[in-house]
């Protein structure tokens, strides 16, 4: 009996979330910006671009699967009074962010915080590829000049665990979101 009530409650909760989500506007978007290395001494800032979708779960909560490609510039490294050039690198990231804030409603400006988890591949010429799990934490806002188009600016701290160490970046980006569905 207890198990039946738990299963029924779980199904009811999932149906509530699905029905709430189906009554909201979904979006797809693209973005571009800068990656600023925070702890790496062998890399300079580079460009990033990506794509994402936004799935509203509740009026204040949304799930955002995303794909990000980033390229980093190399940096000259000095060893024993001699300078050696270092190649830049590429990071490919696939993950999902959870957005908390004003995700629905008639407001023309939406503010939100975000946190997420992602899987990353780091490639650098002359080195073996590294993969690792990462997490993000950030904030952003979106301006909606029309009902179907949103202009967005966000900043994310992106930390990646690689081997015994890690990498950390500040990602600053701007993008466009196209909305479909009903409010």
Residues of each region from the PLM?
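Transmembrane beta-strand segments of Gram-negative outer membrane beta-barrel proteins
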Residues: 23-34, 111-113
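Short, solvent-exposed loop/turn segments at secondary-structure junctions
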Residues: 38, 121-124, 159-161
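Short glycine-rich, acidic/polar surface loops and turns
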Residues: 137-142
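Cleavable N-terminal export/targeting peptides
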Residues: 1-25, 181-183
């Amino acid at each position: 009996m207890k198990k039946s009530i738990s299963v029924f409650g779980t199904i009811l909760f999932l149906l509530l979330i699905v029905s709430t989500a189906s009554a909201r506007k979904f979006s797809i978007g693209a973005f571009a910006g800068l990656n600023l290395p925070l702890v790496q001494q062998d890399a300079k800032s580079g460009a990033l671009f990506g794509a994402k979708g936004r799935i509203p779960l509740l009026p204040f909560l949304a799930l955002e699967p995303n794909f990000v490609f980033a390229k980093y510039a190399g940096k000259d490294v000095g060893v024993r009074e001699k300078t050696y050039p270092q190649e830049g690198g590429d990071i490919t990231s696939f993950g999902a962010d959870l957005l908390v804030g004003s995700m629905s409603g008639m407001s023309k400006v939406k503010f939100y915080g975000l946190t997420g988890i992602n899987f990353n591949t780091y490639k650098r010429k002359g080195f073996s590829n590294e993969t690792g799990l990462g997490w993000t934490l950030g904030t952003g806002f979106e301006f909606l000049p029309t009902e179907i188009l949103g202009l967005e600016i966000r900043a994310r701290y992106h930390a990646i665990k690689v081997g015994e160490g890690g990498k950390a970046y500040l990602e600053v980006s701007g993008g466009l979101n196209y909305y479909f569905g009903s409010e």
